[in-house]
Curated annotation (Swiss-Prot):
Bilayer-crossing regions: none
Intracellular or extracellular location(s): Secreted
Organism: Bothrops leucurus (Whitetail lancehead)
Tissue-wise expression: Expressed by the venom gland.
GO MF, one annotated term: calcium ion binding
EC number: 3.1.1.4
Function: Snake venom phospholipase A2 (PLA2) that exhibits an indirect hemolytic activity, a low myotoxicity, and induces edema. In addition, this enzyme has been shown to induce the release of some pro- and anti-inflammatory cytokines from human PBMC (IL12B, TNF-alpha, IL1B and IL6 but not variation has been observed for IL-8 and IL-10). PLA2 catalyzes the calcium-dependent hydrolysis of the 2-acyl groups in 3-sn-phosphoglycerides.
One GO-annotated biological process of the protein: phospholipid metabolic process
Subunit structure: Monomer.
Protein name: Acidic phospholipase A2
Alphabetic keyword roster: Calcium, Cytolysis, Disulfide bond, Hemolysis, Hydrolase, Lipid degradation, Lipid metabolism, Metal-binding, Myotoxin, Secreted, Toxin
Catalyzed reactions per annotation: a 1,2-diacyl-sn-glycero-3-phosphocholine + H2O = a 1-acyl-sn-glycero-3-phosphocholine + a fatty acid + H(+)
């Protein structure tokens, strides 16, 4: 879940860690479009695709 993902980020990076990802790259935060900018952004892309499986999103 998004809540668990946020908890993991805060655990690794500290309490404000999740705030750093609200507008990171193309896919971290709300929405997304284009190609992921790096491995971290790709992780956010894959996370978004998990929730979008019903629309046929394929993160390969």
């Amino acid at each position: 879940s998004l809540w668990q993902f946020g908890k993991m980020i805060n655990y690794v990076m500290g309490e404000s860690g999740v705030l750093q990802y609200l507008s990171y790259g193309c896919y971290c935060g709300l929405g997304g479009q284009g190609q992921p900018t790096d491995a971290t952004d790709r992780c956010c892309f894959v996370h978004d695709c998990c929730y979008g499986k019903v629309t046929g999103c394929d993160p390969k």
